[in-house]
Structures are given as C-alpha cells and as structure tokens.
Amino acid sequence: MSLGGASERSVPATKIEITVSCRNLLDLDTFSKSDPMVVLYTQSRASQEWREFGRTEVIDNTLNPDFVRKFVLDYFFEEKQNLRFDVYNVDSKTNISKPKDFLGQAFLALGEVIGGQGSRVERTLTGVPGKKCGTILLTAEELSNCRDIATMQLCANKLDKKDFFGKSDPFLVFYRSNEDGTFTICHKTEVVKNTLNPVWQPFSIPVRALCNGDYDRTVKIDVYDWDRDGSHDFIGEFTTSYRELSKAQNQFTVYEVLNPRKKCKKKKYVNSGTVTLLSFSVDSEFTFVDYIKGGTQLNFTVAIDFTASNGNPLQPTSLHYMSPYQLSAYAMALKAVGEIIQDYDSDKLFPAYGFGAKLPPEGRISHQFPLNNNDEDPNCAGIEGVLESYFQSLRTVQLYGPTYFAPVINQVARAAAKISDGSQYYVLLIITDGVISDMTQTKEAIVSASSLPMSIIIVGVGPAMFEAMEELDGDDVRVSSRGRYAERDIVQFVPFRDYVDRSGNQVLSMARLAKDVLAEIPEQLLSYMRTRDIQPRPPPPANPSPIPAPEQP
C-alpha cells in the first residue's frame, strides 16, 4: 500500500543565506561612480533556462559595494545548483538598468560557495569585452533554525478496533505539506501491537523535514492499523503545525482522530479516538554545512570495472564503448557524481583506479591499478582528468577479471584510517557491471570501513541482476561479516538503468542519478562525526578583499 499521497519531493538539506560584495567594478558614470545592483539567476535542471531569483538593493556612487539585502536559497548537497550573478549600473531614480549598464557576471554552483574556505569565494567578473570588470565576493551562512531537531512522544486513546480477532496494531505517519497542496511523508513511528491505547517511543526529526522552516505549515498525521500483507487499514487523521506542537513543551496537547468517510456516513460519529502529545523538545545540532565551513574536505576516489564482461570497448555493444556522439554509461555516471562532489575538495585532485584488467607489458592481473599509470601518484586533475585517464586506460589494458571490490575498498580505508580529527571524509565511487567475485572479503572490508570517515557509492551499469549489490546497501539489513556488524550504513547502491531517460534528456536523468547516490552522504558524514564526538572546527577568520584606497588627484 502507498501511504497517503506522499510526493517524491525531497526536503532541502538546509537554507543558505548568500551575502554579496563587489570590488573594483567598472565605472560607467561620467561625473560620479557607478550605482551597482546584483541580480541572481538560478538554472532549471529540466530546461537549463536561467530564471531571476532576486535582486540586491542599489548602492549609489561606489565601485566597492557591500550589499545588505541577502539571497536565501534551499540547499541540496546532492544537486548541482548553478547560479549566475549579473551586476548592473542602475539609474537610482528610475531603478531601471539598460544593457549598456551591464558591469559583468559570474557563474558558479552553490556548492562551490559552501565548499570554499570558510564558505567564502571570490570570482572574477567577466562579460564586458576588453574590460577588467572587478570581482564578486560571496559568503554562505546557514540559517540558524535549520539546525533544530524536534524530539516528541505521543500516545493514543480508544482508537477504532480494526482487527477481527484482536485489537488494532497502530502506527502514525507524519506528512509535511508542500506549497502546491500535496503532502510529503517525513516520518513513520513503530507499530505497537494489539492495543487501542498505544504509547509510541520518543523520536527525533529535523524541524526542516517537518515544516521546511515554516512554523505555521500544516503537518498531517495519519493513524493506521498495521497489516502483515501491507494493506494497512486507515483509522483516521488529524492536522497540526510545528508552532502548535511546540506548545506541548508546557502542556499536554490532545488531538481528535477523525475518519472523513465515517464522519459523512454516521450522524452520531464523534471520532476514531484521540492522540495525545506527551512531550516535545527542541535542540540544536551540528550540521553538514558546519563541518564543511570548518574545513572538512571530501576526498573523492573512483574505481572502475575493467572486467571482460563489459565487452570489447571497440564494439558498440560494450558498456565501455567510446562513441563520438555519446559518453559511455561509466563516463556518464562518473561525471554526474564527480562534478558535484568536486566542489567540496579544495585541491580537485582525485585518485582513480581500475580493477579486473591485465596490465601491459607482462599481462599481470590487477584489482587496483591507477588509471593514470602512476603508482606513486594516482591523482587526476579534476573530473575531466579522471575521464581522460579512464579513456587512456581503455586503450592500453586488456579487460579480464574476476570482479574484486575488496582491494580498492581496503586501499581507500587505509587512507581514511589515518584521519581521526574530522578534517577529511572519504567517498569511494565504484562503477561496475556485474556479480562480485569476492563477496565475503568485500563484506569484511565494508564492516571494517564502517568505523572510518568513509562512504561507498556503487553504480551498477548494464543489464545484470544486482541482488548482491542490494545486500551491500545496508538500508534494510546491516552488513555483517563473521558475526560482526557494520557500525554504520556506509554503502549506497543504484542501478544505472533506472536513470536512462527514454526521451533522451541525459542532463536531467544524470542529475537524478547523482541526487539519489549522493543524498545519504551528508547524514553518513554526520553519523561518523557524532559517534566519534568530533565537533566542527571554527571557520577560518574572514579575510575579505580590502576596499582599495581612493586614487590621489
């Protein structure tokens, strides 16, 4: 059963406030300095169109403005959120800018601002031929109410009896309302068996997940009777808001559970029971942005499957086939994930390995060879450098086998084991086409890595059945090896074929793939930091570009 019309819209990781300054702008006014204003545009993932998001105020007579009006953006770590900042000289009397008043522009992703040192970046303005346009300075700040965590406990009384041979097995489902009137599921309680008066365990939920920062937004709560076959029986519903829930810090709050169908059919219908909010508290916690702002770097490593089951790279049927018109599935997956994660790595150097190939000249089989053929330094410069090394390896190595994951997992784990202060977190992307040959060793490697600052993303390409991969993705059952369970869930698996867009819109389908494989990374990083009691370091002190001294006459 699908629970109550939940949409697939994700809750933003947080809300980010962008502060804008400019330095050394073009001077277009004859008798005074320019009167600048900045316009922010965001890019639609679907159409790639730029849409105006907002404008700063106009500041008169300056080439070095520090704008007061800020931009507040929803931030999704797992998405490439492209921004464009256009700077204009504005006639302050009419507040109108003309094309000739264009002072320059800058393009960058929101992740680049957050991933900059202290969540600050400075970019050169361009767009006016033959002119130096100056620079734009951007600072990202997380809104404080986005770090709040609500903890609450509820009980119910005299719920409707739904089971023929016993009482109900009730549970609650929480939904956040969206601006378009739909609802998104945001929490489910546990099932309390065989009772009409359940007391549920206390639970915690980010306030942003409950109401997206809008304290008066409707929160709908459905009450269900659990059934083994999944056809859970609807008992009733009630609505509230974060603001109303928070009143329970001082008093119990009782809600009537109403079943609209029963209410219409039965004149004497009163309710289907009541739910009482027993306790409610709010605490703040450190967020993903806190750690990134404090200097935590995401170290991205790539491992690519070079086994023979991929097919001859020279043949169009191969998963590694390099068409002049289209990237291979391997290259598309690598580009989609890497282009987002690189914003959080200051040196943009990425170790990249292959596994399952015979290497020249003697034909040695390797399960962790550097794609750039440099054993001393496997780093590639940027995602383009990784792709270049991958294409070069396809021309020089012989695809072979078997498919071993453990060597490359252990390789990254050895590097992660040297970091214990929260300064670095490792993300390993494995792209593969088939069945793992070293399942036992891979499970052992994952269990060992689960105590380290490390996450593993697996993208399965091709038509193979990936049951073994699903087993490694510990969403339902925690991975175990020799009776030892993984300390944390650190693996995320997705099959590439689920993201092949029949309409041919590769940009959108690869954005969806990146979104799904990266969505769990912030929480996995936070779970590691929490279990080790590692607090984010304070951001480095602000060091803005000084306002140039006025020219001497």
Swiss-Prot record:
Q: Which residues bind Ca(2+) 1?
A: 163, 169, 225, 227
Q: Which Gene Ontology BP terms does the record give? A: cell differentiation; cellular response to calcium ion; positive regulation of dendrite extension
Instruction: Read off the Pfam families from this record.
Output: C2, Copine
One GO MF term on file is: metal ion binding
Q: Does the keyword GTP-binding apply?
A: no
Q: In which tissues is it expressed?
A: Expressed in melanocytes.
Give binding positions for Ca(2+) 2: 163, 225, 227, 233
Pro residues bias (residue ranges): 536-553
Lineage: superkingdom:
Eukaryota
Q: Which UniProt keywords apply?
A: Calcium, Differentiation, Glycoprotein, Metal-binding, Repeat
The record's section on InterPro entries has: C2_dom, C2_domain_sf, C2B_Copine, Copine, Copine_C, VWF_A, vWFA_dom_sf
**Ranges for region Disordered:** 531-553
- UniProt GO cellular component terms: extracellular exosome; extracellular space; plasma membrane
* Glycosylation site list: 95
Enumerate the spans annotated as C2 domain.
1-125, 132-255
Among Gene3D superfamilies, the record links this protein to:
C2 domain
Keyword Calcium belongs to the record: yes
Cofactor(s) needed for function: Ca(2+)
- Domain (VWFA) spans 299-500
> Which family does this protein fall into?
Belongs to the copine family.
Function recorded in the entry:
Probable calcium-dependent phospholipid-binding protein that may play a role in calcium-mediated intracellular processes. Plays a role in dendrite formation by melanocytes.
Q: What is this protein called?
A: Copine-9
